[in-house]
């Protein structure tokens, strides 16, 4: 099935800013994340689709290539990538439950013609609790990746031997093919763009120069991160081939849903249930914050839905600036499971209000409006 346009996937215009892209991705990531949709294959596919779109459009060079050439500009299998790896299957594809696409990757990318090639970038989704994201933390992760083979020091050749120059391309990694009136340059089909051939491969890596390994890494997460933020670990991606530099690892943050708070940028929101009596007479109650409990004064005649702002009780942004606010929305609860005496008291209270609508201004206005509506019919 043909891929959808990346801008369409994120629901943004082609000229969208970086902030708009991030906001759109964050919304989709929160909506379709597997933690929120266990067993939902469609949601999982949409989550991966959003990841792929964001990884391309959030990178200036990849976005430029995509804008000019479409999917072909960022697809290594359509002329933009480098040589094959592990029998044509990328290690990151093998571990697709942990990693999504390379950040523009194939077996390796960014390498020079015929020789050393940079390793692929990798992506790791890091799930955090809201408290961890707000305060910052250090976590240990295990990343399946490719590392340089120690037996052959990454050459792919059996110790004591060396790779030889490819006779098909003469060591440049590219060949020219005649197609009608046109001559096109393509990756050498024999050496896969490396410019070298291995006649006696290393027994440990089978000539690949790289082996599979679970790498354990410590990641320092700064305070204030949010869903969609990326932490770059330079050189922690896949090892390069033929002595090329390693790629990078991008740790993408996903903040789990919190049972009390909802986050919007640097502000937090929560609902606070209050009793009918406290709403009418006023009172004081404790509300939770990420720093502990605080007192909240409820004035008399408080209506459900009223917002109370606790300044500075939100989140300090990761890029600096003052902390946001905590917005508490009160919800007046109707009393239930009343005993006989409580029902009698409420009945007396109701009777006392029947002749005086000033105690319920909204209800009074509503009934007056309804009366005028029927009078006009």
Swiss-Prot record:
Binding site for Zn(2+) 1: 149, 152, 202, 205
Chief location: cytoplasm
SUPFAM superfamilies: Chaperone J-domain, DnaJ/Hsp40 cysteine-rich domain, HSP40/DnaJ peptide-binding domain
Compartments where located: Cytoplasm
GO MF annotation, one: zinc ion binding
UniProt-listed InterPro entries: DnaJ, DnaJ_C, DnaJ_domain, DnaJ_domain_CS, HSP40/DnaJ_pept-bd, HSP_DnaJ_Cys-rich_dom, HSP_DnaJ_Cys-rich_dom_sf, J_dom_sf
Subunit organization: Homodimer.
Family: Belongs to the DnaJ family.
The protein's name: Chaperone protein DnaJ
Organism: Pseudomonas aeruginosa (strain ATCC 15692 / DSM 22644 / CIP 104116 / JCM 14847 / LMG 12228 / 1C / PRS 101 / PAO1)
